[in-house]
Amino acid sequence: MATTSNQNVEFVRTGYGKNMVKVLHIRREGNHHHIIELIANVQLTLKTRKDYLTGDNSDIIPTDTVKNTVHALAKLKGIKSIESFALDICEHFLTAFNHVTRVKVNIDEVPWKRLEKNGVEHNHAFIHCPEALRFCEAEQYLSKTPVVHSGLKDMKVLKTTQTGFEGFLRDRFTTLTDAKDRFFCTSVYARWRYNTINVAFDAAWKAVKDTVIQKFAGPYDRGEYSPSVQKTLYDTQLLVLDRIPEVEEIEIIMPNQHYFVIDMTKIGLSNKDEVYLPLDNPSGNITGTVCRKPRARM
């Protein structure tokens, strides 16, 4: 059997790190407490590859050290937002070690929400409220400006009217009929890239989330008609770019999760669009990514 010589191959990329590093940070302002709980994945790339080539581990920062560093930085720096903390991690490894050339940090935030009653916030009690999961990614190369993405996922929204789907292409396999009025249910995934790191990250994330909900639902008293998932997705992206100048590019994925009227004629009932069958699959999957044209950038 022929063997491949190392003279005939080259590295495309290398990296290692620690995944699923969990931490919860409490910031106390007297009796009023603030918390952020997160799960971080940290990956490092080193200047040399002697660990791969010869088994020389002398440059390797142990992944246990990576975990300890995340915990230590939470203590030393605090956590203002998951994005700012990801940047702190990147900066630490690139400045503390002269042989680290790249750091990539992915963070998911655990969705704790402060308890509130009649407009009064609780000082120190929270409820797990996963209406939309927040995540981010920061990547930085040695002597380069970091690139930051933020995102939301698993935000499930539904409306029972003000949406349709008509005028689509038909061929001999098409059985779908035009729908002037239908359900629209989706689990939104959105990921956007900033053109600067000088961002009020919490406010920007909330603005994107609120914009997605606004374009999906429309005005509360009458809604807003959607002729397709594609149109709603694109209109949402345009409004995000208009409202948040720090966002350079945004990807949105909206799977079309179907609900069908249940045929009850066989049991002697007339179902006039009142009882539906939710179908998890198959589902449509609509995606789009837009960015600012060069002349439109800040």
Swiss-Prot record:
Urate binds at residues 63-64, 165, 182, 229-230, 256. Its EC number is 1.7.3.3. Competitively inhibited by xanthine. The active site is at 18 (charge relay system), 63 (charge relay system), 258 (charge relay system). The keyword Protein transport does not apply. Gene3D superfamilies: Urate Oxidase. Pfam families: Uricase. InterPro entries: Uricase (IPR002042). It comes from the Eukaryota. It is found in: Peroxisome. GO terms for biological process: protein homotetramerization; purine nucleobase catabolic process; urate catabolic process; urate metabolic process. Pathway: Purine metabolism; urate degradation; (S)-allantoin from urate: step 1/3. Keywords: Oxidoreductase, Peroxisome, Purine metabolism. SUPFAM superfamilies: Tetrahydrobiopterin biosynthesis enzymes-like. It catalyses: urate + O2 + H2O = 5-hydroxyisourate + H2O2. GO terms for molecular function: urate oxidase activity. A motif (Microbody targeting signal) lies at residues 296-298. GO terms for cellular component: peroxisome. Belongs to the uricase family. Catalyzes the oxidation of uric acid to 5-hydroxyisourate, which is further processed to form (S)-allantoin. Homotetramer; dimer of dimers. NCBIfam families: urate_oxi. This is Uricase. It comes from Danio rerio. The lineage of its organism: Eukaryota, Metazoa, Chordata, Craniata, Vertebrata.
